């Protein structure tokens, strides 16, 4: 497995730009990816601007790994993700940029790649082009998920302040690796968060791409059972119990 083996790029004025390996262009909607393995490229999936309220992409039961840039690169789009594992991307597991609407449930976003340079998850609502500053509305919800990796903090929230735009996000029943100085006192934004330095996900064998939970994982039994109605099975097709685990996998003790 080697990142960057596939994916198109182009160059303008000495700057190199990369397409997504699977690329949904502006205006595309109603797309579904289910039970897929996407690996060894530049950007696993890129989703460009949506033009209405319809979901651009529903991504479920999928593994994305070993990308030289990002697993997901989204721009002002409408994206639903569940039962999905994204790991070992050189920059981001998921970069949710230029605003948009995002819903992640029972996902595992982790980065232990040797060249891991940026947090596993980045949320952003702005960019500058030709000296003009652009700001977009953002709604993002993460539930029963794991965000972890080898950096001191695996979450970046990049909001343009003092602009009359919507910037709403919530992390609910998630295991987050963040810097100890990261403030999560607002329970409307961070609800039932597992984040102490000793709260480790303890995956079975991350070096071999096995991100199922070990018996001592801090992610066990920490999920909100309200999501069992829509997500009763994990990425392996295992039935979740009445106290679901965080992330894409449910651990069933033998």
Task: Say what each PLM segment does.
Residues 142, 214-215:
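A conserved hydrophobic position in a structured secondary element of the catalytic/binding core
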Residues 211-212, 240:
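Conserved beta-loop-beta connector loops within the AMP-binding
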Residues 238, 243-248:
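C-terminal transmembrane beta-barrel domains of outer membrane proteins
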Residues 1-209, 222-231, 235-236, 249-254:
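Beta-strand/loop edge motif enriched in small/polar residues
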């Amino acid at each position: 497995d080697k990142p960057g083996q596939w994916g198109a790029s182009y160059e303008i004025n000495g700057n190199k730009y990369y397409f997504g390996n699977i690329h949904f262009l502006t205006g595309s909607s109603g797309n579904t990816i289910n039970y897929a393995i996407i690996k060894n490229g530049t950007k696993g999936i890129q989703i460009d601007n949506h033009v209405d309220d319809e979901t651009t992409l529903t991504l479920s039961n999928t593994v994305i790994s070993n990308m030289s840039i990002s697993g997901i690169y989204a721009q002002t789009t409408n994206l639903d993700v569940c039962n999905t594992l994204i790991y070992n991307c050189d920059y981001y597991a998921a970069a949710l940029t230029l605003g948009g609407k995002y819903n992640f449930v029972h996902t595992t976003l982790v980065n232990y790649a040797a060249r891991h340079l940026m947090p596993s998850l980045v949320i952003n609502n702005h960019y500058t082009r030709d000296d003009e500053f652009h700001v977009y509305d953002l709604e993002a919800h993460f539930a029963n998920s794991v965000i972890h990796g080898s950096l001191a903090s695996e979450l970046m929230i990049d909001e343009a302040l003092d602009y009359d735009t919507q910037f709403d996000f919530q992390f609910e029943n998630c295991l987050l690796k963040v810097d100890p100085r990261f403030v999560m006192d607002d329970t409307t934004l961070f609800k039932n968060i597992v984040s102490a330095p000793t709260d480790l996900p303890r995956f079975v064998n991350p070096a071999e791409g096995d991100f199922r939970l070990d018996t001592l994982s801090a992610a066990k039994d920490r999920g909100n059972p309200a999501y069992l109605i829509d997500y009763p099975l994990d990425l392996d097709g295992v039935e979740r119990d009445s106290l679901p685990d965080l992330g894409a996998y449910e651990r069933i003790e033998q």
